[in-house]
């Protein structure tokens, strides 16, 4: 994961405030320098540094330079926001979990393909889950946060019995990843260690977010 210095981070925040997370914004180095109180040359170096760190992308058109905050840039800003939230003790508390994508054993795909569970999750979470789960290995600090989340109000997904076997209940809590509605699911019986969470969504998250093994993700609850 690329890291950036404080000056580059300030530049990234300014681009985001100008709308760079929503789409490409026309931005000259002179205008950026004026807003940040730095020279045009320094502003140009800041943009080059952010582009090298893959926090932004730039395109040159006849009407000027357009700058877009990339997904990596958004995730950096989300982590920064989470730090400020801790400092100022934001109420209606948001819990932020950070971790990396890992492969599962296919258990989630099996359960998310069962019509009963699909219907329950659609009713309780507001989306029909993609048949599969995104497995995330939490970093050590997020493991502690995840434990604190057990005191929150989780939604119970009832179990059921068919002619062959009994399917146990599960619990879930709504969350988002890069703005996409999701839910953390905890089966009644789970084989995962405490540092692993399973996330469901109405979309294939790996494809939608271009995630690969060990990609870093930020999960926001609340």
UniProtKB/Swiss-Prot annotation:
GO terms for biological process: FMN biosynthetic process; riboflavin biosynthetic process. Mg(2+) binds at residues 133, 135. It comes from Methanocorpusculum labreanum (strain ATCC 43576 / DSM 4855 / Z). It catalyses: riboflavin + CTP = CDP + FMN + H(+). Pathway: Cofactor biosynthesis; FMN biosynthesis; FMN from riboflavin (CTP route): step 1/1. InterPro entries: ArsR-like_HTH, RibK_CTP-dep, Riboflavin_kinase_archaeal, Riboflavin_kinase_CTP-dep, Riboflavin_kinase_dom_sf, WH-like_DNA-bd_sf, WH_DNA-bd_sf. Keywords: Flavoprotein, FMN, Kinase, Magnesium, Metal-binding, Nucleotide-binding, Transferase. This is Riboflavin kinase.
């Amino acid at each position: 994961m690329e890291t950036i210095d404080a000056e580059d981070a300030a530049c990234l925040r300014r681009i985001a405030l100008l709308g760079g997370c929503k789409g490409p914004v026309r931005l000259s180095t002179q205008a950026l320098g004026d807003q940040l109180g730095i020279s045009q040359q320094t502003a140009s170096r800041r943009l080059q540094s952010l582009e090298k760190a893959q926090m932004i992308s730039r395109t040159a058109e006849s009407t000027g330079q357009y700058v877009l905050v990339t997904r990596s840039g958004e995730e950096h800003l989300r982590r920064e926001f989470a730090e400020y939230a801790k400092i100022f003790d934001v109420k209606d508390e948001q819990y932020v979990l950070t971790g990396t994508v890992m492969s599962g054993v296919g258990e989630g795909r099996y359960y998310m393909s069962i019509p009963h569970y699909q219907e329950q999750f659609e009713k309780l979470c507001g989306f029909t889950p993609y048949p599969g789960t995104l497995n995330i290995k939490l970093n050590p600090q997020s493991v502690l946060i995840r434990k604190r989340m057990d005191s929150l109000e989780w939604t119970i997904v009832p179990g059921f019995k068919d002619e062959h076997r009994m399917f146990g209940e599960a619990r879930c809590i709504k969350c988002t990843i890069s703005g996409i509605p999701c839910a953390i699911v905890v089966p009644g019986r789970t084989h995962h260690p405490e540092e692993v969470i399973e996330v469901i969504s109405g979309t294939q998250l790996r494809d939608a977010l271009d995630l690969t093994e060990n990609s870093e993700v930020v999960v926001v609850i609340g």
